[in-house]
Structure formats: C-alpha cells, structure tokens
C-alpha cells in the first residue's frame, strides 16, 4: 500500500487528467509557436557566439569571462 504524503496530495490534481486526450489538435499550435520562438532564441545565441551578430561594446571572448 502506498503511503500518502503532503506532496502527493498537492500533485494529485495534476495527474487527474492522465490518459485523456484533447479533441482535435488540442494545444499543438501553441506548442509550435513556442518551438519557433525557442528556435529564434537559439539562432540569436549562435549568431552572437559566431560573431555574425555584431553588438557594439560587447566582448564575446572567453577571456572576458575570466
């Protein structure tokens, strides 16, 4: 028999929807938007690291971190 804990009681409502599937596409478009925004974020970080995005007055060398 599983022991009841206060953390389990708090998290139980999150698990009450287990196994249920939203009809149609559900939240897929929202997820796609956030994935696109995350991709843009990663591209900006890559461009800063690769110095293809020039930021005046910002030194991006490893020596500047030390």
Curated annotation (Swiss-Prot):
It is found in: Cellular thylakoid membrane. One of its GO terms (cellular component) is photosystem II. The keyword rRNA-binding does not apply. InterPro entries: PSII_PsbH, PSII_PsbH_sf. One of its GO terms (molecular function) is phosphate ion binding. It comes from the Bacteria. The keyword Nucleotide-binding does not apply. It is a single-pass membrane protein. It holds the Pfam family PsbH. Disruption phenotype: Not essential for photoautotrophic growth, however PSII is less stable, a considerable amount is missing the oxygen evolving complex, and it is missing PsbX. Keywords: Membrane, Photosynthesis, Photosystem II, Thylakoid, Transmembrane, Transmembrane helix. Residues 48-66 are lumenal. The chain crosses the membrane at residues 28-47. Gene3D superfamilies: Photosystem II reaction center protein H (1.20.5.880). PSII binds multiple chlorophylls, carotenoids and specific lipids. GO terms for biological process: photosynthesis; protein stabilization. Residues 2-27 are cytoplasmic. One of the components of the core complex of photosystem II (PSII), required for its stability and/or assembly. PSII is a light-driven water:plastoquinone oxidoreductase that uses light energy to abstract electrons from H(2)O, generating O(2) and a proton gradient subsequently used for ATP formation. It consists of a core antenna complex that captures photons, and an electron transfer chain that converts photonic excitation into a charge separation. Belongs to the PsbH family. PSII is composed of 1 copy each of membrane proteins PsbA, PsbB, PsbC, PsbD, PsbE, PsbF, PsbH, PsbI, PsbJ, PsbK, PsbL, PsbM, PsbT, PsbX, PsbY, PsbZ, Psb30/Ycf12, peripheral proteins PsbO, CyanoQ (PsbQ), PsbU, PsbV and a large number of cofactors. It forms dimeric complexes. Part of a photosystem II (PSII) assembly intermediate complex PSII-I; crystallized from a strain deleted of psbJ, it forms monomeric PSII before addition of the oxygen evolving complex. PSII-I includes 3 assembly factors not found in mature PSII (Psb27, Psb28 and Psb34). This is Photosystem II reaction center protein H. It comes from Thermosynechococcus vestitus (strain NIES-2133 / IAM M-273 / BP-1). The gene is psbH.
